[in-house]
Amino acid sequence: MEVDINGVNRTNNSVPSTTEGSSPSKPDPEKPRCSSTPCSPIRRTVSGYQILHMDANFLVGFTTGEELLKLAHKCATTEENPGESLPAFRSKQLESGLSRSSRIYKARGRQYQPYEIPAVNGRRRRRMPSSGDKCNKAVPYEPYKAVHGPLPLCLLKGKRAHSKSLDYLNLDKMNIKESADTEVLQYQLQHLTLRGDRVFARNNT
């Protein structure tokens, strides 16, 4: 019954083999002490599994767990195969714990960094379509639609870096004698400025 109490469900195969091999050499009072205290290196399998369980849950005590496993490997020399499988499993747990923690930090970097740093860029990108939306909302000037048609895409989308400049208007090539070109220029300048709506309405009347 003590073997059932001491052993974990995972260690059903390893615990009876340790008790069979070391029960004549070790007295009985050591079994509950080893099972109750995970730091005692007398029983390698039970203490090793308890340390693994603690590390898997709380991710603490990697060095102490390794030292205890080394001491347990020195103390219990009768069984070689479980001794080789346990440190391998322990190293797998250690690697999985480290990779899990690194994954957590990477996920934190993915979560916080893209939202903090490019917030200005996102705001800048949001600002340009908002001006485009204002342009679309302020389009109820029907005669100007009939004169020159829809606005150019660089004004509506605003994705280029030089979209706010007046280079795309081709001022040097424009004929000021034609009234339609001046109206197009005035209409485009209206939507480049915020207070152009009132100014353009005042100049038009």
Curated annotation (Swiss-Prot):
The keyword Cell wall biogenesis/degradation does not apply. PANTHER family: MACROPHAGE IMMUNOMETABOLISM REGULATOR, UNC119-BINDING PROTEIN C5ORF30. Belongs to the UNC119-binding protein family. Its main location: cytoplasm. Residues 8-25 have a biased composition (Polar residues). GO terms for biological process: cilium assembly; inflammatory response; negative regulation of inflammatory response; protein transport. It comes from Xenopus tropicalis (Western clawed frog). This is Macrophage immunometabolism regulator. Interacts with unc119 family proteins; interaction preferentially takes place when unc119 proteins are unliganded with myristoylated proteins. One of its GO terms (cellular component) is ciliary transition zone.
